[in-house]
Swiss-Prot record:
One of its GO terms (biological process) is DNA recombination. This is DNA repair protein RecO. The gene is recO. It comes from Pseudomonas fluorescens (strain Pf0-1). It holds the Pfam family RecO_C. Belongs to the RecO family. Keywords: DNA damage, DNA recombination, DNA repair.
Amino acid sequence: MSQSPPPAQPAYVLHSRAYRETSALVDFLTPQGRLRAVLRSARGKAGTLARPFVPLEVEFRGKGELKNVGRMESVGNATWMVGEALFSGLYLNELLIRLLPAEDPHPAVFDHYAATLLALAEGRPLEPLLRSFEWRLLDDLGYGFSLNTDINDEPVAVDGLYRLQVDAGLERVYLLQPGLFNGTELLAMAEADWSAPGALSAAKRLMRQALAVHLGGRPLVSRELFRKP
């Protein structure tokens, strides 16, 4: 009795690079996590689909960590982005490659990624989208912390000053020092109130601090795109 092929699953290409003569080594984001697979005949029709931001349906074969692409089809229009929206999409992809463990299912991350791509393509403001994605990714990976309470379970005070103890939470401090956050900013972040003065810039600093320890010492290449003229 012949064995039926594995079911196809929704996927996005995070990164692709040449592999051997005519193949490509592709990192995919799926509801089942980040999967790496060999795409054969990458110079043909399949190769034109193996690019970021195209909603795909992919059949993966093989039980090892390195799989093979059995079938790959587009299931919608590619998300068209240019300029800083494109750089933002590439930033999301690099974050996922660096932070998401291989074959560790995170369906909520997949859904939020797809929704964020659509919002970027629609021209929505970039900073709130990026901060929301970073925060939810950290939370889904188990690295999240409360913005309403500190590490002693005390409510964040509007007039308080706080520093981030990575993987622990917010600690109230009483002496000025670099890298602090005020309570007003933190409470605005908790409500996603990006109209509050200083909330977006503080959220960017907070996410940088929270992500840094998990990214290691190697800088994100995609961040450099924003700095180029």
